[in-house]
Amino acid sequence: MEVLSEQQLFFMRKAVALGEKGRIFAPPNPWVGCVIVKNGCVIGEGWHQGIGSPHAEVCAVQDQKCSLEGAEVFVTLEPCCHFGRTPPCVDLLIKSKVAAVYVGLLDPDPRVCKKGVARLQAAGIPVYVGVGSQEAKTSLQPYLYQRERGLPWVVMKTAASLDGQTADRGGSSQWISGELARADVGKLRAESQAIIVGARTVCLDNPRLSARFPHGDLYERQPLRVVVDSRGTVPLESRVFDLSSGSTLFATTQQCPKEYIQKLKDLGVEVWESSSHQVDLKGLLRYLAERGCLQVLVEGGAQLHSAFWQQKLVNAGVIYWGPKFLGDQGQPMLRDLQLSLVTAEHVRITETSLVRDSVKTCFECLEQESVDKKG
């Protein structure tokens, strides 16, 4: 629908900002925000803080500062109308006798889609869908994509020197970007439900793949660490197999020795096996989506990044440009794609910012392979 007023857009943007507060803990649920307004003043606000906890609308109602009768509700995603871990939000809004509900986006979840709106309308409450829809879509893109495609939103993350190299000639890629950039990566990891890396990256850098605050403390919720290794070449003493600070999934093939797999299982590592001679990346993504992953972060290296690009599985990316030059003996960001200017992947730059001594570039892919849940 057409935006009715700048004031309504303002309140929806506020709801989107509130929803973002739940981005780390809400998944596999969407990070929804809600604002309740009466006589032009905010009388209640809330956001979904995690699975099993009250939804945004309930939190906003509980935050009320006066009677909700005649109030307007601004919510980023269509209110739910089914019993899950919590009761339907529409019933509470109807009981509260609100005057109108403004919805940023319809929920693609078939249990909710258009049903929540219909329930409210059947109760005589006007519902306006589409206010601030672009802002809501930008915020909830991983959730929307996962529900519509059956695949998580894939973000390619890498750090590169100013001449585009992601590792030195020996293959080491640690500390290309600055300290604040690495802190920013910690937040990006925390906002993702899984981090995917290749065997070479683990062998060369031995990363922990943990999500940390700038001062070094771990985020309370850690992403699943996923190691892609077709043959079982990663040393068993690698940090990613230390489960004291997070879980690890080992994605492999039938070429991996059974003894190696058993040792991983003895360590508590989950093993996902592909029947082909290479790890089925799309099948792996589908499995992660079934586990509730809305966004996954692919951290490389170049071989794994290239495989995701070749299969058109990348949705967006973040590049941290460090203040270094590594020369033509370094490792490229992507390899063996054999693209020309005509066949090159097109992206839209969504952000360029300075993170102290590094430059952060964010992009979204414009050309995506058409996929469905059976694809």
From Swiss-Prot:
Cofactor: Zn(2+)
Keywords: Hydrolase, Metal-binding, Multifunctional enzyme, NADP, Oxidoreductase, Riboflavin biosynthesis, Zinc
Record-listed Zn(2+) binding positions: H55, C80, C89
InterPro entries: APOBEC/CMP_deaminase_Zn-bd (IPR016192), CMP_dCMP_dom (IPR002125), Cytidine_deaminase-like (IPR016193), DHFR-like_dom_sf (IPR024072), Eubact_RibD (IPR004794), RibD_C (IPR011549), RibDG_C (IPR002734), Riboflavin_Biosynth_HTPR (IPR050765)
Cofactor binding note from Swiss-Prot or TrEMBL: Binds 1 zinc ion.
Keyword Cell wall biogenesis/degradation: no
Record Pfam families: dCMP_cyt_deam_1 (PF00383), RibD_C (PF01872)
EC number: 3.5.4.26, 1.1.1.193
Binding-site positions, substrate: S173, R189, L209, R212, E299
Reactions listed under catalytic activity: 2,5-diamino-6-hydroxy-4-(5-phosphoribosylamino)-pyrimidine + H2O + H(+) = 5-amino-6-(5-phospho-D-ribosylamino)uracil + NH4(+); 5-amino-6-(5-phospho-D-ribitylamino)uracil + NADP(+) = 5-amino-6-(5-phospho-D-ribosylamino)uracil + NADPH + H(+)
Region (Reductase): 151-375
Residues in CMP/dCMP-type deaminase domain copies: 6-127
GO molecular function, one term: diaminohydroxyphosphoribosylaminopyrimidine deaminase activity
Region of interest called Deaminase, as start-end residue ranges on this chain: 1-150
Positions with a binding annotation for NADP(+): A159, W175, T201, D205, S230, G301, A302, Q303, L304, H305, S306, A307
Gene Ontology annotations of biological process type: riboflavin biosynthetic process
SUPFAM superfamilies: Cytidine deaminase-like (SSF53927), Dihydrofolate reductase-like (SSF53597)
Pathway(s) the chain acts in: Cofactor biosynthesis; riboflavin biosynthesis; 5-amino-6-(D-ribitylamino)uracil from GTP: step 2/4; Cofactor biosynthesis; riboflavin biosynthesis; 5-amino-6-(D-ribitylamino)uracil from GTP: step 3/4
Positions annotated as active site in the UniProt record: E57
Task of the protein: Converts 2,5-diamino-6-(ribosylamino)-4(3h)-pyrimidinone 5'-phosphate into 5-amino-6-(ribosylamino)-2,4(1h,3h)-pyrimidinedione 5'-phosphate.
Family: In the N-terminal section; belongs to the cytidine and deoxycytidylate deaminase family.
PANTHER family according to UniProt: 2,5-DIAMINO-6-RIBOSYLAMINO-4(3H)-PYRIMIDINONE 5'-PHOSPHATE REDUCTASE, DIHYDROFOLATE REDUCTASE FAMILY PROTEIN (AFU_ORTHOLOGUE AFUA_8G06820)
Protein's name in the database: Riboflavin biosynthesis protein RibD
